[in-house]
Amino acid sequence: MKFIAIGFILLSTTSYSQTQIIQWQKDKLLPNKVSMSLERINGNEAVRVVKDSTIKEVDEPTFVKLTDTDFKNGIIEVNVLSRLLKNATETARGFIGIAFRINAQNTAFENMYIRPTNGRAESQLRRNRATQYFSFPDFKFDRLRKEAPGEYESYADMALNEWIHLRIEVNGKQAKLYVNHSKQPVLLVNDLKLGADASGAIGLWVDVGTEGFFSDMKVTKR
């Protein structure tokens, strides 16, 4: 029994490799269809990201790519804060999230993001759409919502202009999103559209109308 116990301990401690604390170094941050700056907000070192206003389509590769990341399976954790730009339209929701498994050409990636204005909206339908999964280029939110209503979005409590902790666990074709240290995932996706073997970089993603901030990021590969 002692040998079995020791073996279990070794297995559990080696399931994940060492956690990588992401340092915000400009030479390792590559903006793609966004503007980027390093700032301090509420005492935290953060990356500020705003979508290029000439990009009218939604669910696009509008992110800051972390060039020193190569991610397939594991855990991504980050604190995000979202504000609405002064020129944001009524349909702006504070879209902010994480792109992962980004290919070298930025033409394919998976994504999980949040809509902070929906978290406490006076509409149950909007609350039910506080989180979102999509896969670029073929499975944007509108297609997923039409073909599988409610399956790729869900409710979570959140608001604008406050730090929100996101944790994404990825394993093969499955991804789980946890918000603000929830014990259970608020969104569960069992069929990542790029498949179990996709891998690539991680990106700090925003969409239309958002002034987004990212802080305290760490990545643990499996």
Where are these regions (language model features)?
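Bacterial Sec-dependent N-terminal signal peptides
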Residues: 1-20
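Extracellular glycan-recognition regions
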Residues: 18-222
